Curated annotation (Swiss-Prot):
Disulfide linkage: none
Domain of life: Bacteria
Family label: Belongs to the bacterial ribosomal protein bL25 family. CTC subfamily.
Protein's organism: Dictyoglomus turgidum (strain DSM 6724 / Z-1310)
GO process annotations (BP): translation
Its job: This is one of the proteins that binds to the 5S RNA in the ribosome where it forms part of the central protuberance.
Gene3D superfamilies recorded: Ribosomal protein L25, beta domain, Ribosomal Protein L25, Chain P
InterPro entries assigned to the protein according to its UniProt record, in alphabetical order: Rbsml_bL25/Gln-tRNA_synth_N, Ribosomal_bL25/Gln-tRNA_synth, Ribosomal_bL25_b-dom, Ribosomal_bL25_C, Ribosomal_bL25_long, Ribosomal_L25_dom, Ribosomal_uL5_bac-type
Keywords in alphabetical order: Ribonucleoprotein, Ribosomal protein, RNA-binding, rRNA-binding
Protein name: Large ribosomal subunit protein bL25
Cellular component per GO, a single term: cytosolic large ribosomal subunit
CDD domains: Ribosomal_L25_TL5_CTC
MF GO annotations: 5S rRNA binding; structural constituent of ribosome
Subunit structure of this chain's protein: Part of the 50S ribosomal subunit; part of the 5S rRNA/L5/L18/L25 subcomplex. Contacts the 5S rRNA. Binds to the 5S rRNA independently of L5 and L18.
Length: 207
């Protein structure tokens, strides 16, 4: 897992009224939590730094972060992953961010997004791509977590699908998503189904 460093500031004032003031100053309120922490750490993140994380794919892919938490003259460093980023759906503005603090020796359960690669044979034949699960839950050490999981659909034909169980993972990654979950499939268009049915009917009438 790639490591990205980001500086944040510890905040003492908590509540909606303070959160609004912070956001007007381009500071996004957030929290850092983790099993090894004595208590949650309430923080402020520069709006531009969050945009930078998004541009690097952190909102869609898994990356390890090194949080530099400034508290006056004191500084705390925590390894973390971006757990949740709340965005106002109307104004398209950041509201709050959650970071999950972890140790590098600690197994973590994380959702890793799926990246489809290649052009399926079934699509060239007129089939329709049907998405299943868009991310897979895995358990691994932080440095072993991939940013995404590539699924090659090149040989996928009409009527075929790929399940989680069809994917290959290294031994240091445990898959927690049910293996029978469908990742992607190619379904036939209506015309294709009718043609097959008509052909079968003609064969049956000749026997």
């Amino acid at each position: 897992m790639e490591i990205t460093e980001i500086k944040v500031k510890k905040r003492d004032k908590i509540g909606k009224q303070f959160a609004k003031k912070y956001r007007r100053s381009n500071l996004i309120p957030g929290v850092v939590y983790g099993a090894h922490l004595k208590e949650n750490i309430h923080i402020l993140v520069e709006k531009k730094d969050l945009w930078s994380l998004i541009k690097k794919g952190h909102a869609k892919e898994q990356h390890l972060l090194r949080l530099i938490i400034e508290n006056g003259e004191n500084t705390i460093t925590e390894n973390a992953i971006l757990q949740d980023l709340q965005i106002d759906p109307i104004k398209d503005e950041f509201l709050h961010v959650d970071f999950h603090a972890i140790t590098l020796e600690e197994l973590v359960d994380v959702y890793v997004p799926i990246l489809l690669v290649g052009e399926a044979k079934g699509i060239k034949q007129g089939g329709i791509l049907q998405h299943g699960v868009e991310e897979i839950l895995i358990r691994a050490l932080p440095l072993d977590v991939p940013p995404h999981i590539e699924v090659d659909i090149t040989d996928l034909e009409i009527g075929e699908s790929i399940t989680v169980g069809d994917l290959k993972f290294p031994e240091n990654i445990k898959v927690l998503t049910p293996l029978d979950e469908v990742v992607v499939g190619i379904i036939p268009p209506k015309g294709y189904t009718e043609e097959v049915t008509t052909g079968e009917a003609q064969t049956e009438s000749q026997t």
